[in-house]
Amino acid sequence: DMDYDMANSDIKPNYMQRKALRELNRYRAIGQERALVISATGSGKTYLAAFDALNFNPDRLLYIVHEGSILKKSLETFQKVFGGSKTCGLYNAEAKETEEDFLFSTNVSMCRSLELFDKKEFDYIIIDECHHAVADSYRKIIDYFEPEFLLGLTATENRMDNQDVVEIFGNNIPYELRLRDAIINDLIVPFHYFGIRDELVDYGLTASGERRLISQISTPENCEFIHQQIEKHRMEGQKLKALAFCRNIQHARMMADNLGDYYHTAFLSGKNKTGERIRAYNDLQDENRDLEILFAVDILNEGVDIPGVNMV
């Protein structure tokens, strides 16, 4: 049945996705109504979900994720897989498209609107980046709806607070694809990892010393050291396209300012609208644009695909 249904799509699942699809089919065949797929970042989780939905063939589908740019890219992925056979709509702060076959919603928007939907409104529900599923907004959505099948997607089921994500999905993990296996199977790009000793910063500071730690990291002396390391390890003859992860907005602003002495920099946070973020991602990857280092706070930790990046 799966092979027959897949023939209806111009885009085909890769080898690893086909293994996951077979296992999801098997779990449903034995009566399981929930499952969690663990798959390395960038290995094709969204396409996997779209292929499984194509095989399941729901009348109505709900896709939940926490971030707007991920939401729109997920919608586009489903449109590519389904073609014109299903209508797709957004349900977030900017749009409330409720009549479409498939709805793509942020957790916050859907949590605030549950009373507008019947409990059995959706046959198939997908929770993307589902390590967030222990949060109240997600739990309200999961506890409210009664789909025929609930699928969770994540790159890691482990949380710093040790709350159990797997239990939410009935302790069912039909498929796992860890980082090493994804690289071996050419699903994600291999990378060179450099551990660099930094003697200018006291990393032994406790949480209460966070401001002091950020000040040390952002000093001109330390930024000069970072500049030296970037130049030592960057891709020779190529435009630098680097992402830098920061603790908070103050940290990002200070790093962008100080490394701005050497590179064209910018910083983004949750305060930037989706359109602003996408423009920055495009500028970073564009050979004809000046942007070389993009500093980010919280928004690039998961679910964003920026294939042109050559340094983190």
PLM regions with names:
Residues 30-53, 245, 295:
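Walker A/P-loop
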Residues 93-124, 135-140:
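Conserved helix/coil segment N-terminal to the catalytic DExD/H
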Residues 122-123, 292-296, 300-312:
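A short beta-strand element within the Helicase C-terminal
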Residues 48, 55-80, 247-250:
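Conserved Walker A/P-loop ATP-binding site and its immediately adjacent core
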Residues 131-193:
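Post-DEXD/H (motif II) to motif III coupling segment of the RecA-like Helicase ATP-binding lobe
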Residues 72, 87-98, 243, 253-254, ...:
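Conserved helicase ATPase core of P-loop NTP-dependent helicases/translocases
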Residues 2-36:
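Conserved pre-motif I regulatory segment
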Residues 173-243:
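Conserved interdomain linker/interface between the two RecA-like ATPase lobes of SF2 helicase motors
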